[in-house]
Amino acid sequence: MINRNTENQFKLVSKYAPSGDQPQAIETLVDNIEGGEKAQILMGATGTGKTYTMSQVIARVNKPTLVIAHNKTLAGQLYSEFKEFFPENAVEYFVSYYDYYQPEAYVPSSDTYIEKDSSVNDEIDKLRHSATSALLERNDVIVVASVSCIYGLGSPKEYSDSVVSLRPGQEISRDQLLNALVDIQFERNDIDFQRGRFRVRGDVVEIFPASRDEHAFRVEFFGDEIDRIREIESLTGKVLGDVDHLAIFPATHFVTNDDHMETAIAKIQAELEEQLKVFEAEGKLLEAQRLKQRTDYDIEMLREMGYTNGVENYSRHMDGRSEGEPPYTLLDFFPEDYLIMIDESHMTMGQIKGMYNGDRSRKEMLVNYGFRLPSALDNRPLRREEFESHVHQIVYVSATPGDYEMEQTETVVEQIIRPTGLLDPEVEVRPTMGQMDDLLGEINARVEKGERTFITTLTKKMAEDLTDYLKEMGVKVKYMHSDIKTLERTEIIRDLRLGVFDVLIGINLLREGIDVPEVSLVAILDADKEGFLRNERGLIQTIGRAARNSEGHVIMYADKVTESMRKAMEETARRRQIQMAYNEEHGIIPQTIKKEIRDLISVTKAVTQDKEEVVDFNALNKDERKAMIKKLEGQMQEAAEVLDFELAAQIRDMVIELKNM
């Protein structure tokens, strides 16, 4: 068992002081948390500095904090920002460690069994271990996670109880240490020294923790006593310093002691016998044979190795849980008094709700056809109500909070004023009759001023027809549809910003990375057609695309004003009035955001800050493409090593697309 250090304090580092209505938002959120309020909403308009406000709140309340985002990219962006704000504290990153993941599945219509296939990202696996070990060691921890944090993880008690604690002067033989390391799933490898491994050289044992990537530890023995513990560079063996105490956490999150393992194996065998009887009674002899063969193999592996592929499917037995009981997750590694912040909650809470059902239907198929025992159903994500039971205090963060969040709390803290003084755009409704000619005139007016235009349509056909029409009228226009790959998409956005073309047409322009300060006009066609993209939240998000420019303007083309349109316009006008009053009172003149145009599709050496090298990928021959892939993979590794996961993911997408060219 390891004792958590609760004395560390969060220390926020920033050259900016809170401005606009950030001070009021921070004060209200902190007062409510300290007053014991369970749930509240931070409703912050686009570009108002919500992450900075979140950081200020974390520093003030000084609680371990879990920040959940709805995808890896956004989690990576938040992680980078929090690392900058809290350089002296433990800012951790916990997302799915699969670069590629094909879950185990069975398709009865074609009698196809799809074995689990995955590629584990070693860097992310390290960071996951770093997150869980930090949560057990200290209090000043921020974990930025995707919704994978509600998936089953091993028992935190078993994980904590399995920690091997070492100190100079401690009486323990070398062989006892080696056995202890094997028990927590470390591998002995005297040649290839990597994370989760140890090597032995006489009376010296070198251990490479699962949560590290550069530094390892050297334990020197004198007889049956530890003489000295040193931190070393894993590659060179260079000594970095002496260590008074070393805690070695297990190399896997699914770990159990020998007694619990025997009990678990007995339960697995008993369940197997029960399920075989069920299959035989139903005449499912093939399923029975399949299940017995697979389970017997897994039991043998658990007995001999303490581990098997797919061990998580037996986690209910290994954790000692009852049928239907929720699994342990990352949330169980936090102390009781912790804070949850849900970023883009209108998206993230929907994901949390939907995870359980999708997982359940796939696993039921595996159980029904003899690929897994029924207990595999309890290796699952949390249901939403189970997630709610883990909530001590929570802040939902969104420009457009969903109905669920609004039902949870009446406490809504607004953040409307932008530090740049920028206003929400003016919004007007125009009739659909003659909309093409009207829109053409508006576009030409923007082109003359060197500004750009977004047009959002509801159908692919309308987008294509509009693109053709505008091209005939001499407008430089492009259409961005869902089939466009990442590489092309980033190139299109860059070309729009540079003025290679002036108008971008799309169906859903709400995706992250579409904030373009040069866009002063957003045109919404078929604004009165109710649906996902034309509901109140969708419209507010689309309107926000024009909020980065001081000349921001939105035109909705519609024959009637729907309830969603009315609410979106009223909310935008309300925010705009507040922003204008603040600017007038403080003498602020709105300034368009000056955002550097990064050559996203060029081979950027961002890690070393060298100058950019622009490459036309389409002009490369086969050998040049191979060389480029190798070069990019090196840069991807460098980006990951300095924790710039956003860039690493971008480069990874380029590599994938280059391989497919």
Curated annotation (Swiss-Prot):
SUPFAM superfamilies: C-terminal UvrC-binding domain of UvrB (SSF46600), P-loop containing nucleoside triphosphate hydrolases (SSF52540). CDD domains: DEXHc_UvrB, SF2_C_UvrB. Residues 435-601 form the Helicase C-terminal domain. It is found in: Cytoplasm. ATP binds at residues 44-51. Keywords: ATP-binding, Cytoplasm, DNA damage, DNA excision, DNA repair, Excision nuclease, Helicase, Hydrolase, Nucleotide-binding, SOS response. Residues 31-186 form the Helicase ATP-binding domain. GO terms for cellular component: cytoplasm; excinuclease repair complex. One of its GO terms (molecular function) is helicase activity. A motif (Beta-hairpin) lies at residues 97-120. Forms a heterotetramer with UvrA during the search for lesions. Interacts with UvrC in an incision complex. The beta-hairpin motif is involved in DNA binding. This is UvrABC system protein B. It comes from Streptococcus suis (strain 98HAH33). The gene is uvrB.
